[in-house]
Each structure stands twice: as structure tokens, then as C-alpha cells.
């Protein structure tokens, strides 16, 4: 690092250690654990602080609905199941990064060294260099709050459970317009003026999309479908989606997304 001709003296040396672990459960009756109190990972990929924020995003809207009497306490159980799933994903990716950086076996070291040697000269090997893949929001596949995917032509990246990707629109960006409400995103299909289920308001947001002029919106939310309707949670994860507006299906999905269906 300093060069072979530079004289230096070590003043202090320490061994850096960390742990990748989590609690068995994040909810214990009226006590809820989040952030480092619930799970710990290595610093690779900035997964510690980011996962703590994701815990808060997941918990706060559920807690508010329960406190306001608009959802049963069982909704908080989904915080446990979803964020345990997210913690396991972070621990897996964090462990893979640290195992690449500090191999635990001779075979792993041979693989790591070969990847580093090849990546210097060949582009195909560079994605294999695992120096800490950056943290990404978790897709809650299999969540009890998800409804069955009714948009088979839609993109996989916005399936139920997935975080909403941002898109540039004529008047700004999509995510700031979603806010922290339940939102019914209607693309190339009529939207209702307003809808309320068991005291929970559902705010409609209608967008038109020409795939020729807004390819990002089309690729991320339409796929091969000409139109789409998305039910979006307050933490901006997809709860359900359909090819067109159907009030009965939407009300049922909203009840399911609040542990009432």
C-alpha cells in the first residue's frame, strides 16, 4: 500500500471481528425488535443500517393500523415473518461476501484467487468478484399479505411482494407520488375516484403509458400487458396486481394486505 521503499512502524494492530446472526423471532407479544437488536451482519454491502431502515418501513404502517383499530394485532406477525425473511437474505449475501474476501477453506481460496486473476484480463470474470454486493430492498415472496399474481404478462420485478422501482414521469418521479398510503396504481386503465375498506383509504393514482415514449414505466410495470392495476402498500411494496380494475378483487386484496382476509 505504501510502497516497498517507504519506511513505517506499526503503532497499533487489532483483529476485526463481526457476526452474521439474528434472533429466532422479531416479535414477542408487545415487544418488537428491529435493526441491530434483531439481526447483525458484516459491513459488506451496507446491509446493517439499510436493513434497519427496511425494518422500520415494514413496521410503522402496520403498527399505526393496529393502534388506530383498523387492523388486528395479527398484522404485526407479518412484520416478524417478512423481516426474518429479509434478515436471512442479508445474512446469506453478507456471508458470501466475507467468505470471498477471507476464504474459509483451501478450495474457496483457490476459487477466489482464480477469479481475481481472471478478472484482471477477462470481463466475464468481473461480476464474480464479490467484494460486498450493495444492499437492496427485499422481495417478500410468499408473504401472507400477498395476493396471487393476476398479471401473468407483468414484469417479474414488480410481482406481489416486490418493492416498487422508481420511474421518471412527466411531473417528477413515481415513488414520491406514492407517499405512505395504500395506493391503487392504474396504468392505461380507468381508476375510481376514491375507495375505502373497513376505514382504510385507498388512494388512486392514474397514469397513461406509451411504451414508445416511456419505456422505463412500461418495462417495470407493464411488461407485455397493455394495462395494469397495482395495489401498493404504505411501505411501497406490491400487495397485488391485475390487468384491469375490479372492485371486488381489490377490496379482498386490501383486506388480505392488512391481515383481515
Language-model-detected regions and their locations in the chain:
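FAD/FMN-dependent oxidoreductases across multiple families
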Residues: 1-47, 93
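Secondary-structure transition/capping motifs at alpha-helix termini
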Residues: 1-6, 59, 65-73
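Alpha-helix capping and helix-loop boundary segments enriched in small/acidic/polar residues
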Residues: 17, 21, 46-51, 70, ...
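Catalytic cores of eukaryotic secretory-pathway lumenal/extracellular enzymes that build
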Residues: 44-50, 57, 76, 86-90
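Helical substrate-recognition/capping region of FAD-dependent monooxygenase/halogenase enzymes
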Residues: 67-261
Amino acid at each position: 500500500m505504501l510502497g516497498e521503499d517507504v519506511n513505517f512502524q506499526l503503532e497499533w494492530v487489532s483483529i476485526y471481528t463481526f457476526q452474521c446472526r439474528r434472533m429466532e423471532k422479531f416479535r414477542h407479544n408487545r415487544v418488537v425488535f428491529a435493526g441491530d437488536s434483531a439481526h447483525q451482519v458484516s459491513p459488506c454491502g451496507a446491509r446493517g443500517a439499510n436493513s434497519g431502515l427496511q425494518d422500520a418501513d415494514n413496521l410503522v404502517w402496520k403498527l399505526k393500523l393496529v393502534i388506530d383499530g383498523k387492523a388486528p394485532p395479527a398484522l404485526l406477525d407479518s412484520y416478524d415473518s417478512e423481516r426474518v425473511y429479509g434478515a436471512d437474505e442479508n445474512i446469506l449475501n453478507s456471508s458470501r461476501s466475507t467468505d470471498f474476501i477471507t476464504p474459509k477453506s483451501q478450495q474457496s481460496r483457490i476459487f477466489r484467487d482464480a477469479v481475481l486473476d481472471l478478472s484482471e484480463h477477462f470481463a466475464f470474470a468481473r461480476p464474480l468478484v464479490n467484494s460486498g454486493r450493495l444492499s437492496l430492498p427485499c422481495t417478500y415472496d410468499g408473504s401472507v399479505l400477498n395476493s396471487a399474481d393476476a398479471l401473468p404478462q407483468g414484469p417479474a420485478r414488480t410481482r406481489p411482494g416486490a418493492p416498487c422501482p422508481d420511474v421518471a414521469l412527466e411531473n417528477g418521479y413515481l415513488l414520491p407520488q406514492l407517499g405512505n398510503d395504500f395506493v391503487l396504481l392504474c396504468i392505461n386503465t380507468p381508476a375510481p375516484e376514491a375507495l375505502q375498506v373497513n376505514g382504510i383509504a385507498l388512494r388512486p393514482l392514474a397514469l397513461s403509458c406509451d411504451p414508445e415514449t416511456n419505456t422505463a414505466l412500461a418495462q417495470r410495470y407493464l411488461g407485455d400487458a397493455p394495462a395494469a392495476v397495482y395495489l401498493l402498500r404504505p411501505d411501497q411494496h406490491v400487495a397485488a396486481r391485475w390487468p384491469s380494475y375490479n372492485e371486488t378483487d381489490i377490496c379482498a386484496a386490501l383486506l388480505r394486505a392488512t391481515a383481515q382476509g
